């Protein structure tokens, strides 16, 4: 068997490119790829820089699902507002959590929304406080700090909003269903010595009203509450 060792490039009787021509073509392709990559990177940076919005205030409202509230009450579990959060009233049947910082980019919608205040879950002599809520829009979750532990857990999973409005200095997300995560269910069951909580439990419906448009740079203005 004869082994062919001669390159087809520039071989007699073939129409292949010469080595210098091939090198020139390869260099041109590399240059085009570099230019394309640079343009894509620049466009991406422009897209994020031009549409990233630092938040200056606002609030997130959480209305507890009626069936879930009844189940918690029947089991002797109380849910209370802590810190800067406000508890439901007859006129305002929802918990209110002030927005104290964060940054959001418009398209696609993403970023972080930072809150003050929190919730205390208690049963008998056991209790646990979750606070410093952060909505992570890119992951569609709400994380929380567990008081006294320094641990931050993924507390809630967020459904797609029924409506989104951006303008007039506000970002409004309406009709966001929130469900307990497996991690949060385990933490609550352990802290309260119960087996009541389960991942996927519908907690309720949230409405986010975030403000922007002043000199605030989206920095968190509350150290801890």
Regions found by a protein language model. Give the residues of each.
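N-terminal segment immediately downstream of the Sec signal-peptide cleavage site
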Residues: 43-108, 177-218
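An N-terminal domain-start capping segment
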Residues: 13, 24-26, 121
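Extended amphipathic ligand-handling, pore-lining, and cofactor/metal-binding catalytic surfaces
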Residues: 149-185
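Short, solvent-exposed mixed-charge patches
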Residues: 222-225
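Predominantly extracellular/secreted and cell-surface proteins with exposed
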Residues: 82-158
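Generic beta-strand hydrophobic packing signal
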Residues: 119, 131-133, 169, 176, ...
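Bacterial N-terminal signal peptides
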Residues: 24-38
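N-terminal secretory signal peptides that target proteins for export/translocation
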Residues: 1-21
């Amino acid at each position: 068997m004869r082994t062919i060792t001669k390159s087809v490039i520039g071989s007699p009787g073939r129409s292949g490119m010469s080595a210098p021509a091939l090198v020139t073509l390869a260099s041109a392709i590399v240059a085009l790829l570099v230019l394309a990559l640079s343009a894509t990177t620049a466009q991406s940076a422009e897209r994020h820089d031009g549409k990233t919005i630092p938040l200056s205030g606002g609030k997130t409202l959480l209305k507890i699902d009626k069936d879930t509230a009844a189940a918690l009450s029947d089991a002797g579990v109380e849910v209370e507002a802590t810190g800067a959060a406000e508890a439901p009233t007859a006129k305002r049947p929802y918990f209110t959590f002030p927005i104290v910082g964060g940054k959001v980019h418009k398209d696609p919608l993403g970023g972080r929304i930072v809150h003050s205040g929190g919730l205390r879950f208690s049963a008998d002599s056991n209790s646990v406080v979750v606070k410093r809520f952060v909505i992570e829009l890119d992951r569609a979750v709400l994380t929380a700090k567990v008081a006294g532990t320094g641990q931050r857990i993924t507390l809630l999973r967020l459904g797609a909003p029924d409506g989104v409005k951006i303008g007039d200095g506000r970002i409004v997300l309406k009709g966001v269903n929130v469900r307990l995560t497996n991690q949060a269910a385990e933490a609550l069951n352990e802290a309260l010595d119960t087996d009541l909580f389960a991942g996927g439990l519908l907690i309720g419906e949230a409405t986010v009203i975030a403000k922007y448009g002043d000199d605030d740079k989206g920095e968190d203005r509350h150290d801890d509450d």
